[in-house]
Each structure stands twice: as structure tokens, then as C-alpha cells.
């Protein structure tokens, strides 16, 4: 047997409107998706609670439901209304009581004095690897917005606004998904609740005009991707004449040789196997030229060495990072007869005979004797 709307809200059939509203608040809060994330059962119950409330809070729909049942409502456009809100007014009042003041109500609408433009904005600036590391001068072209003086930033002819017909001055509209109604900012007035009856001819209803400008900027040493540099008083111009700031967001390119990690530089450097065995002072490239690395005898493949203060200067201080050199030992891929003979003699001089070194042979003998004992 199908559960009734009264049972869903846990009320009796003779409940008055205030009782229905209180019951809805309780059940909606209990099963709201924000409090039951990922719970499909709670989501389904929340939909039923909204469905029940939309019927029982409406005298006409409730009377039809009480007399003919749920099926009688389907043909009459259940879940919708001529105003397009589908019970939105009551839903907004209810949700405001436990999700913040003014949810879905006119108290959330913006003031017509609000700016149509933000005071600050961001522009991206691409730099080469070296420009970011060592700093540079860059000329930046940008576009900024200036609040329209003709309409005082309203976008309306002579600055005159009328109540938005879409949201009736609320600044929000109800959007239904099934039996659930959500509040969203009115797309026609952007939440102000008012709009122009006739657009300003100067700004075409935007409330602002755009202008182009350029500025030369000194990029400091050590900037990196994601960092922002503030340029004072180069932002948008607001109604009261104050001007915001422009933020320049750095996008630094990578390098084919060096890898940067904050203020440290990494490089993989090839070393011939004889250099690794014998040890040697070698020259390695750095971001400033080259430096000497004293390679110890018996250096291992992948071993890392630190060249202090050969990295990037910190953008906020005078500290300089390090360069980390990771060696990659290289072996010859082809040998002539003379080289082959020399290597064979070298191999024999280390006691390698019949393809096995004396130490390896001794180890095998120890293992064999262990099994015999």
C-alpha cells in the first residue's frame, strides 16, 4: 500500500497549515542532501517530503488529494504553478530558518547601488625560464572597465530602473528539479531585483565602458608560475571614482636542461664510466654559466651532488637556492679491437676468469659447502 502524504510528514489528516509547515521543516532538515551526502535513501525521502509539502500546503491541491488521491493531481499540472515558483515562497522561508538568513527570499537580493564590475582583475603574463629566474622588464597591454558615468553604472537610460519582471524584485528565481525547488540568482537582473526598462545608449546596458592601457612592469628575480604581482591603481574604476588594482599572474616556461623546484635547480649530467671509477673534477652547466664538481672515486649511477648557492634567488629575500646534480654513468656502446683487448686485460687483472670473479667463485663454494654440511 502506498504511503500517504500525511504519513510522510508524520502528521494527522486534520493537521492545520502551521503544523504542516513545522513537520516539513523537521523532515526536510532530517533528510536534506547536505546532511546526508551519498545517501540515496535519504535523497529519495527528501524528494517525497517536498512532494508531500507542496500538495498539503496548497488548499486546492490538498482538497483534491483528500477526495481523489494522488493520481488526480497528475493531470492538473502537479508540481507547477502559473507563477513559475511552484511553492517557492514557502520553501525559501523554510530553508532560511536553518541554512542562513534570506535563502530564497528578497532579503538576499543585491542593492541597485552594487557595482556591476569588480574593483580588481587578473591578467596572465608568460615569461621564459630565464626571465622568471633573473627578472626582466615587460610591457603589459590590458583592458580595464570604467563605471558608466551616463547612467551611473546602472545600465539604464537616465539611470532609471524598474522592478525585474522575471523575479518580481526578489533577485532570485525558483528552479524545479522534479519535486524539489531550488533558489538561484535571477539571470535577467543578476540578483539586483531591478533592471533597465531602456538600456543606456552609452554603455549598451552593461553599466560600464572598456578602455585599453599599457604599463611597464619590473619583474623581480625568482618569480615562478602561479605567483601574482600587484600593480596598484590599475584596476577597474568604480562609481565613486575609486580604482582597484591589477594583478599580474606569472606563467613561467620550462627549460630543456634545468628543472626548477622553488629556488633549487636540478640537472642530470652524463659521466663516463672511467670518470666515475677514478674520480675527477668536472665542469657542469649552471643557470649562471658553469661550476666545478669534484667527482669522488667510485661515484654511483644516480648519485646526487649539491652545488651550494647555484640556484634561484628567493623572490622575497636574498637567499639563493642550490643546484642538485644527478650523475648518469655512461658506458661505451661499441669498441675497437685495441679497446676490447685493454678491457679484457683489465678484467683479468681484477681476477675475473671464466666469466666469474674470484669473490663470486668463493661465494658459490661457501653456499655449496653449506648444503653439504
Curated annotation (Swiss-Prot):
UniProt superkingdom: Bacteria
Cofactor: Zn(2+)
Cofactor note: Binds 2 Zn(2+) ions per monomer.
CXXCXGXG motif repeats: 148-155, 164-171, 186-193, 200-207
Main location: cytoplasm
Pfam family, one: DnaJ
GO BP terms: chaperone cofactor-dependent protein refolding; DNA replication; protein refolding; response to heat
Assigned keywords, A-Z: Chaperone, Cytoplasm, DNA replication, Metal-binding, Repeat, Stress response, Zinc, Zinc-finger
Zinc finger (CR-type): 135-212
Entry binding sites for Zn(2+) 2: 164, 167, 186, 189
Subcellular location: Cytoplasm
GO cellular component annotations of the record: cytoplasm
GO function terms (MF aspect): ATP binding; heat shock protein binding; unfolded protein binding; zinc ion binding
Every J domain range: 4-69
Keyword field contains Manganese: no
Binding residues for Zn(2+) 1: 148, 151, 200, 203
Record's comment describing the protein's domains: The J domain is necessary and sufficient to stimulate DnaK ATPase activity. Zinc center 1 plays an important role in the autonomous, DnaK-independent chaperone activity of DnaJ. Zinc center 2 is essential for interaction with DnaK and for DnaJ activity.
Subunit relationships: Homodimer.
NCBIfam families xrefs: DnaJ_bact, PRK10767.1
HAMAP family per the UniProt record, alphabetical: DnaJ
Listed name of the protein: Chaperone protein DnaJ
Species annotation: Campylobacter jejuni (strain RM1221)
Amino acid at each position: 500500500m502506498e504511503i500517504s502524504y500525511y504519513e510522510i510528514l508524520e502528521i494527522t489528516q486534520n493537521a492545520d497549515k502551521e503544523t504542516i509547515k513545522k513537520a516539513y521543516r523537521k523532515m526536510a532538515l532530517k533528510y536534506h542532501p547536505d546532511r546526508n551526502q551519498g545517501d540515496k535513501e535519504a535523497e529519495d525521502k527528501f524528494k517525497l517530503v517536498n512532494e508531500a509539502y507542496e500538495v498539503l500546503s496548497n488548499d486546492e491541491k490538498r482538497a483534491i488529494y483528500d477526495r481523489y488521491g494522488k493520481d488526480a493531481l497528475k493531470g492538473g499540472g502537479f508540481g507547477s504553478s502559473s507563477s513559475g515558483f511552484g511553492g517557492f515562497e514557502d520553501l525559501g522561508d523554510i530553508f532560511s530558518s536553518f541554512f542562513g538568513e534570506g535563502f530564497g527570499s528578497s532579503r538576499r537580493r543585491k542593492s541597485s547601488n552594487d557595482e556591476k564590475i569588480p574593483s580588481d582583475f587578473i591578467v596572465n603574463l608568460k615569461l621564459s625560464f630565464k626571465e622568471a629566474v633573473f627578472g626582466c622588464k615587460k610591457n603589459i597591454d590590458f583592458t580595464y572597465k570604467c563605471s558608466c558615468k551616463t547612467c551611473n553604472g546602472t545600465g539604464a537610460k537616465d539611470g532609471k530602473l524598474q522592478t525585474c519582471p522575471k523575479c518580481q524584485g526578489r533577485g532570485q528565481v525558483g528552479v524545479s528539479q522534479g519535486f524539489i525547488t531550488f533558489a538561484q540568482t535571477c539571470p535577467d537582473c543578476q540578483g539586483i531585483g531591478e533592471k533597465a526598462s531602456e538600456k543606456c545608449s552609452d554603455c549598451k546596458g552593461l553599466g560600464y565602458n572598456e578602455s585599453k592601457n599599457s604599463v611597464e612592469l619590473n619583474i623581480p628575480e625568482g618569480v615562478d608560475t602561479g605567483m601574482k604581482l600587484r600593480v596598484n591603481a590599475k584596476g577597474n574604476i568604480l562609481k565613486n571614482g575609486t580604482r582597484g588594482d591589477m594583478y599580474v599572474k606569472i606563467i613561467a616556461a620550462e627549460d630543456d636542461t634545468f628543472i626548477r623546484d622553488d629556488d633549487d635547480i636540478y640537472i642530470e649530467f652524463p659521466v663516463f664510466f672511467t670518470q666515475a671509477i677514478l674520480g675527477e673534477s668536472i665542469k657542469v652547466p649552471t643557470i649562471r654559466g658553469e661550476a666545478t664538481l669534484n667527482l669522488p672515486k667510485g661515484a654511483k649511477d644516480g648519485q646526487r651532488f649539491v652545488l651550494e648557492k647555484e640556484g634561484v634567488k628567493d623572490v622575497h629575500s636574498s637567499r639563493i637556492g642550490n643546484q642538485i646534480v644527478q650523475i648518469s654513468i655512461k658506458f661505451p656502446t661499441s669498441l675497437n679491437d685495441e679497446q676490447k683487448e685493454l678491457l679484457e686485460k683489465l678484467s683479468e687483472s681484477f681476477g675475473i676468469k671464466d666469466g666469474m670473479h674470484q669473490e663470486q667463485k668463493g661465494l658459490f663454494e661457501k653456499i655449496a659447502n653449506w648444503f653439504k654440511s
